[in-house]
């Protein structure tokens, strides 16, 4: 249904944001 679709999209967005934050932290810690 619509709710499950929204949840799926939200999970995808959250994963992308988390990945970007991790990459940023790695850059700050180890250098890019």
From Swiss-Prot:
Keywords: Amphibian defense peptide, Antibiotic, Antimicrobial, Disulfide bond, Fungicide, Secreted
Intrachain disulfide bonds: 27-32
Location(s), subcellular: Secreted
Cellular compartments per GO CC: extracellular region
InterPro entries: Antimicrobial_frog_2
Entry keyword Secreted: yes
Tissue note: Expressed by the skin glands.
Pfam family, one: Antimicrobial_2
TM ranges: none
GO BP term, example: defense response to fungus
Role: Antibacterial activity against Gram-positive bacterium S.aureus and Gram-negative bacterium E.coli. Has activity against C.albicans.
Family the entry assigns: Belongs to the frog skin active peptide (FSAP) family. Ranatuerin subfamily.
Name recorded for this polypeptide: Ranatuerin-2Lb
Organism phylogeny: Eukaryota, Metazoa, Chordata, Craniata, Vertebrata
